[in-house]
Amino acid sequence: MNLYGLVADIGGTNARLALCNLENGVIERIETYSAKQHAGLESIISHYLAEQKTVVTYACIAIACPINGDWVEMTNHQWAFSISELKRTLGLEKLDVINDFTAVSMAIPMLTEEYKLQLGGGEAVKDKPIAVYGAGTGLGVAHLIKVDKQWVSLPGEGGHVDFAANSEEQDAILAVLRRKFGHVSVERILSGSGLVNLYQAIAILDHRQPEDLEPETVTQRALDKSCQYCHRALTLFCEIMGRFGGNLALNMGTFGGVYIAGGIVPRFLDFFRQSNFLHGFEDKGRFKPLVQQIPVYLITHPQPGLLGSGTYLRQQLSLID
């Protein structure tokens, strides 16, 4: 067997590629490319392997979209491809293409304590269901369950469920966003663009003309308190992150923990920890005592998508006990 397998984490903005040591799962030689600068996935993979002067026969690619059959179309990018054709073109013996949050979920059993920050709740119960979600370009969601000796990821498109307003203020925001989008999914709020949507809706409700800001600008103005609408948007973002996470905890009784991934929250971690996130997570009425037992963590590993892709590949090759 070739010592290395190719692993990739393909998002709407960036494509991260690496080699996974199939014996021990260590992720090596990580490179990040702009998805906008390449015509397609085959181009990026070929470029990476040429740079590394490496030939691989096994690969696992995590990608930000539903995987239903051979044809794959990305949700937040124009790329589309055939899995079988990509496998043939790259000369691979095995190619697994999985949802990006399938990969993130598969990383969780491999995380050491240094790569997870507990935000609340009790102790995780061994081998119980796990939930993971994260805001970035979009909102990813997955669950993880233990079946016999293997972890099985249950991916889905949970970011596209209806946004559930929980106050009069949120009702008003929902009405503004409904006029703009029609269907308002929770991803319209819990994502980079969603943070901007929140800011703009809050400004409109105060009869002001919102600026066309980038998510990073909304965050910065919130943190330095130079814009009351940005500050309120980030405050609500944190609370709604908690409410959504608490919903996931209830859905499957995730006593193994609820994990937050994604690139947004670490940018304002101190603000997040002092926010109403945990209140939102636990505010489940009669079931508050139950949810308070469930631990909630922030994943601090720099590349959980690559780590999880490697774990998935090694498990498929029966290299993990």
Curated annotation (Swiss-Prot):
Its EC number is 2.7.1.2. It is an enzyme of class 2 (transferase). It is found in: Cytoplasm. ATP binds at residues 8-13. Signal peptide: none annotated. GO terms for molecular function: ATP binding; D-glucose binding; glucokinase activity. Its main location: cytoplasm. Disulfide bonds: none annotated. Keywords: ATP-binding, Cytoplasm, Glycolysis, Kinase, Nucleotide-binding, Transferase. Gene3D superfamilies: 3.30.420.40, 3.40.367.20. InterPro entries: ATPase_NBD (IPR043129), Bacterial_glucokinase (IPR050201), Glucokinase (IPR003836). GO terms for biological process: glycolytic process. It catalyses: D-glucose + ATP = D-glucose 6-phosphate + ADP + H(+). One of its GO terms (cellular component) is cytosol. Belongs to the bacterial glucokinase family. This is Glucokinase. The gene is glk.
